[in-house]
């Protein structure tokens, strides 16, 4: 785990290279790229550069994933507005609009708004959230685990999920490995719980859902919470069931005092926790809770 640190006795150059590629560079671009693609989905290719610049500015200002999400939507709609404002340009100059006018003005307007309007309050909110979670960590570990686990399932990859995940990474950097154990457990439960429900309550899911449930086993095991989104979108009752199961799993990891120094990996990094079996038990119990709740609240499906 610490072999990328030159001060650690286990240091080796290959691990340091991997850390430089991933942690020092690739991971720092995640928010910027996310914002760029959000903007592009709204305004097509001219929105990508303004969105990416806005997302990078959010990262630099410690506004986190929430700042990046706002930057993406902001840049996208800024470019949409520019497209409407510049309809008067002669058709002979249309080629300039997507490669020069929209990106250039989009970057300028998005950058100014991010710098003077968005970044400061969003960064303050993220800092408040981090400090609040840290205060819970010193006062009541189990309560912190319940909250962090539940946050991972509320929006399954959205701002709250990413806020919890970002907090966990920050705690790992600070040498506190307990919070991220709850976070990763909570993030695995929604797809795993749904997968179990489709297996043991087959009559309450369509054939297509049962087939998708098999995929959820793998996505849950790999800590891909987003695998549960199609089920939640089709039936909102999935969300409270997932939140309860994730909160149970997160609370149990803190009750068992599990620590996890790895930022990602799902069940495949369980062996590096201080209590691998108790960690896996926490995840299984949380998934079972979600599955049972779904089995109770969902009605049988009539196959045509």
UniProtKB/Swiss-Prot annotation:
Keywords: Cell membrane, Membrane, Phosphotransferase system, Sugar transport, Transmembrane, Transmembrane helix, Transport. The phosphoenolpyruvate-dependent sugar phosphotransferase system (PTS), a major carbohydrate active -transport system, catalyzes the phosphorylation of incoming sugar substrates concomitant with their translocation across the cell membrane. This system is involved in fructose transport. It is a multi-pass membrane protein. Residues 1-304 form the PTS EIIC type-2 domain. GO terms for molecular function: carbohydrate:proton symporter activity; protein-N(PI)-phosphohistidine-sugar phosphotransferase activity; protein-phosphocysteine-sugar phosphotransferase activity. GO terms for biological process: phosphoenolpyruvate-dependent sugar phosphotransferase system. It is found in: Cell membrane. The EIIC domain forms the PTS system translocation channel and contains the specific substrate-binding site. This is Fructose permease IIC component. GO terms for cellular component: plasma membrane. The keyword RNA-binding does not apply. The gene is fruA. It comes from Bacillus amyloliquefaciens (Bacillus velezensis). The keyword Nucleotide-binding does not apply. Signal peptide: none annotated. The chain crosses the membrane at residues 20-40, 62-82, 98-118, 140-160, 181-201, 214-234, 238-258, 277-297. PROSITE patterns: PTS_EIIC_TYPE_2.
